[in-house]
Design a protein with these regions (language model features):
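Hydrophobic, Gly/Ser/Ala-rich alpha-helical and linker tracts in large acyl-processing enzymes
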Residues: 185-198, 205-208, 214
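Secondary-structure transition/hinge residues
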Residues: 73, 116, 165, 169, ...
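A general boundary/transition motif marking the beginning of the first structured unit of a protein
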Residues: 113, 192-197, 295, 314
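N-terminal Rossmann-like NAD(P)+-binding domain of SDR-like oxidoreductases, especially those catalyzing
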Residues: 1-184
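C-terminal substrate-binding subdomain of Rossmann-fold SDR/epimerase-dehydratase oxidoreductases
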Residues: 201-341
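Short-chain dehydrogenase/reductase
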Residues: 98, 147-155, 191-199, 203, ...
Length: 341
């Protein structure tokens, strides 16, 4: 049987493909290269030493999704990464975000049921918790109160999947709530390659370290945290990818609906990350303190005990390795995958 990885050429998707192939799974990758490129998948093949099926397709096109399932009748599980993902852009383009992100999953669900595929793992996010009343965050914390349309698309999609799961006793759903994925494959062959100005902290720091950007902008140093900067639960992307392999095994037990945080359970501040990256690259990272960004919260990290208990999974990498692997990727690929073109 095979696993459909929608959005499999993206940052998390490509690393997950590597781990799936290493675990012996057959995969079908679908991507429209909206925020990714073919070179990422060429490098996945190089790392894994294995080939796989690929379809260039947009998940918002139901006919295209239907064709994938019709031509690959052995698909029995979907890992759904396909979505727009820039928080800031979602605020200025809410219609595009709601249309795209909801349609991708709705189309997949509709086609799945016609092809007797009963397992789906959804790429959700800690953003569904909004501004939590306390930390660490457990899976039974309230969902909602999101501060941007991107986060709200995750809440809505979780609700859709939950309703479908309740309506169909054969459907098994894993909602994986990621915290802050960073890092790159230890080989340095694949990593995060954002189009344009990076939206996330570590790719931005990496661009500063490699000389592509002047300095890091730290948004606020007056939060109620040890050094005044925002605290987040950063997780190595390879650990996150391994969590998806564990989730497949969980779905094989036919749990119905399964919800799980994927994080380390440790919070690191913005300045902690800057200092760790500085050590990794052997350079001082210049930064400037800017005003807080609207919608940012002071601290966010998870209680990962459910993942350990029910998936047999826990994060292996610490912040030092996350930064070292990011630097290894960035220093060898200063222009991302364009370096290879």
């Amino acid at each position: 049987m095979a696993i459909l990885v929608s959005g499999g050429a993206g940052y998390i998707g490509s690393h997950t493909c590597v781990e799936l192939l290493a675990a012996g799974y057959d995969i079908v990758v679908a991507d429209n290269y909206y925020n990714s490129c073919p070179e990422a998948l060429a490098r996945v093949k190089k790392i894994a030493g294995k080939d796989f099926r690929f379809v260039e397709a947009d998940m918002t096109d139901k006919d295209a999704v239907e064709k994938i399932f019709a031509e690959n009748e052995d698909i029995d599980c979907v890992i759904q990464f396909a979505a727009y993902k820039a928080v800031g852009e979602s605020v200025s383009k809410p219609i595009e975000y709601y249309s795209n992100n909801l349609a991708c999953t709705l189309n997949i669900l509709d086609v799945m049921r016609r092809h007797n595929c009963h397992n789906i793992i959804f790429s959700s996010s800690a953003t569904v918790y909004g501004d939590p009343a306390s930390v660490p965050i457990r899976e039974d914390f309230p969902v909602g109160g999101t501060t941007n349309p991107y986060g709200t698309t995750k809440v809505f999609t979780e609700r859709i999947l939950t309703d479908c799961c309740h309506a169909d006793p054969e459907l098994n759903v894993a909602l994986l709530r990621y915290f802050n994925p960073i890092g790159a494959h230890p080989s340095g062959l694949i990593g995060e390659a954002p189009n344009g100005l990076p939206n996330n902290l570590v790719p931005y720091i990496a661009k500063v370290a490699v000389g592509k950007l002047e300095k890091v902008h730290v948004f606020g140093n007056d939060y109620p945290t040890p050094d005044g900067t925002g605290v987040r639960d950063y997780i190595h992307v390879v650990d996150l990818a391994r969590g998806h392999v564990a989730a497949i095994k969980k779905l094989e037990q036919k749990p119905g609906l399964f919800i799980c945080n994927l994080g380390t359970g440790h919070g690191y501040s913005v300045l902690d990350v800057i200092n760790a990256f500085s050590k990794a690259c052997g350079k001082e990272i210049p930064y400037v303190i800017d005003p807080r960004r609207p919608g940012d919260i002071a601290e966010c990290w998870c209680d990962p005990s459910k993942a350990k208990r029910e998936l047999g999974w826990e994060a292996q990498y610490g912040i030092e390795e996350m930064c070292a692997h990011s630097w290894n990727w960035q220093s060898h690929n200063p222009d991302g995958y364009k370096t290879a073109e």
